[in-house]
Every structure is written in C-alpha cells, then in structure tokens.
Amino acid sequence: SQSPYLGIELGMTNRGLMGTGLMMNDSSITPEELLAIKMDTRYAKSSWVKSWMDSLLAVDTKGDAKLGEAQKLRREWDWSSDGKGKADAIAERLIRHAARANWRNDPLPDPRETLQKTVDEFSERFGRLDPALGDIQRLRRGKVDLPMLGGTDTLRATTMWDGEQADGKMRVRHGDSFIMLVRWDKAGQVVSESIQPYGAATNRPESPHYTDQMKLYVAGKFKPVHFEWADAGKHAKRRYRP
C-alpha cells in the first residue's frame, strides 16, 4: 500500500495511456516513429475523457437548439485534436473545463452547466460552435501568430489557454516545451534533434532567435543540433567572443 504522506498520484492521464499503448504496440521503434508518438493528438477511450464526454451526451437538450447543436458536435467528434474535425475546438474546450478537477481528483463539473457555458462562450467569442481548432487556438509571440493543434491531455500538449486576447482567440500558454531526441549511430557518432515552442533567445525580442522555431514547432518538426565542434563551426552564422 502507498503511504498517503508520499503524495503519489494513482490516476492515469490520457497522455500516459496513449504513450504506453503506442510504444507497447511497436516492438522496434524508429526515431521517426518515436517523434510521431510524441506529436500524437488522440484521446484514448479508456481514459477519464471518455466518461466525461459521455456524460455530456446524457444531457437532455430538448427545447434548446444551441445545446442540441453542441451535443451533436460532441457526438461527431473523432477523438483527436488534430484540427481535421469540425468538432475539435468545442471538444477541447469541454475537456479543458473538466481537466483540472480530474487532475485534482475533485468531482467533475455539472455536464449541463459546462455544455451551456461552452455554448455561450463560443457564441460570444467566435459567433459559431464549430470554428476550426487552429483558427482559435494560437501560438503567439511578438509579431508571430500561428495555428496550434494538440490538446489538454494529449501527447502533443497544449494544456492551458490565455483567453484574454483582443480578438477573443485562445493563446496557448502552457504545454510542450523543449523536446530533444538523441541517438548514436553504429560508429558511436551522436545525432540529435530538438525543438522548442518559440526560440533560443527567450527574453530578447530583438533577436532573430526569439521566434525562429515557431513554424517548425507548430508543424511538429525538429531542427538538427550541431553537437560536434566541427559540425557547429560549419553551420555557424557568426563567430564572436562574448
């Protein structure tokens, strides 16, 4: 048994379930497959998300056309936040309303109230219930503004929104950060790739590296890391002494 004083979380996230399942189902994972797993945007029907989303389908929406429309979108949702389905955006919002309570092991919010709150919010912010996920979920920094996919509890993590934007859209402010894949070839040579949401110059807006990784990041791509001195020198843009 676990001591209650250790603070060990016994719940399983969707990320944990999806990561375990995807890696267990592949006996030999290539670097490309591993990176694809990291960028997975799906929800497992064995996760907490299934029971929560099912509870929204149980809401009686008779006499309320907007609630009925939201429920229909939920029913048509394809269990992914890849931006391909017209229900992805509202599904993400519905999941997000319950995610903190689930993480804290608190009672989940009332399904009808959550459905109504989401309908009201989407109607006010976007004028429709089925905006494309990438249209409303944005990665923003400086003058760069890009569509961002992924979800609250997916391996491709976009776990929190900053909703106080002038245009009413949702700026991603929490989720994936620095990601690196390191491997060694048969000769023992290290090969690595990395990416982060914005750029290496994290607090220098005047630098070209303040936002230069954003396009790669939203595309789920990586850049090479020039680890060896000779390789770094070959790709250097400028040489200087601090």
Feature-to-residue mapping (PLM):
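C-terminal/peripheral segments of proteins
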Residues: 1-242
